[in-house]
Amino acid sequence: MSILEIKGLSHRYDERDLFVNSDLTVNNGEHIGVVGLNGAGKSTFINILAGKLLQDEGEVKRLPGLRIGYLDQHATLPKDETVMAYLRDAFSYLDELNLKLEEIYNKMGEADGDELDRLIEKSAKMQQRLDDSGYYDLDSQIKKVANGLGVNKFGYDAIIGTLSGGERAKLMLSKLLLEEHDLTLLDEPTNFLDIEHVEWLVKYLTSYKKTFLVISHDVAFLNRVATTIVSIENGQIRKFSGNYDKYLEQREMLNKQYEAAYDRQQAEIKKMQDYIAKNGARASTAGMANSRKKMLDRIEVMAKPTVERDCSFSFPYLELNTKDMLVVKNLKVG
């Protein structure tokens, strides 16, 4: 089932086309990796999906009621709040439900007859929802996710304002996962994560029942968590089935097909141009040359295939006559 559709998406940034008349469908339960060169527009694309940025042209249709979560590592956090209070806020809707349930229980003491029956039925449904959500064991649910990302290392009683940038990133990711949105948008989620926490995140995402899109430069990570790849390249958004390695195989095949089609078109264009140049001035062939000219004008010329170049670097260095290459004291990472 489709939960989000993009039609005719076009957007420019800094006088450059990022997307041109692109279409895309996101289906329920898809695990999508978003790839492209730096500056291709990956983060812009995610921001448009999240509704944080308005596209220049085109339509983004979201399923009514779709809950979208976005990992914004530049978001401002409540500095005076504790880590646990911040994480607990992921379940604020359950706290509100519990308050409403208590209000109903209070009303029951003064109700009777049909009104009492109605309140009993309503409270039973609300109680069942709280039970099914594990409301009375939320701390355990919270720590299961947060511990997996290393939040326990800086403590649940810690004040957010005292945390480092890496610690805040882990905290925001933890809350986002706890909220379990219908569509989760992740921009470089492995930043600041240790290897053990990346491993935990891989296991979590591969078993995730809902939909997510993730931007990452970590190829090994993408290969393990993505079952679909969305590529942003040359102003086009294209969707490929499979992980990153499968995408590379399909992309290479499509690029070869495109290059062959481009070469055929260029050969045909040159052939027509040569004919027009040779026959345009002759009275006997000018009509046919003019006809070829009209055909040439109607051709939609294919864009020249881009050529990717590999870069290599070599940095000169001096050998140091010392045993201590690096000395660190009281280092704090993440």
Feature roles, as predicted:
Residues 250-275, 279-305:
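Intracellular alpha-helical coupling/juxtamembrane segments of multi-pass membrane proteins
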Residues 1-262, 309, 315-334:
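ABC ATP-binding cassette signature C-motif
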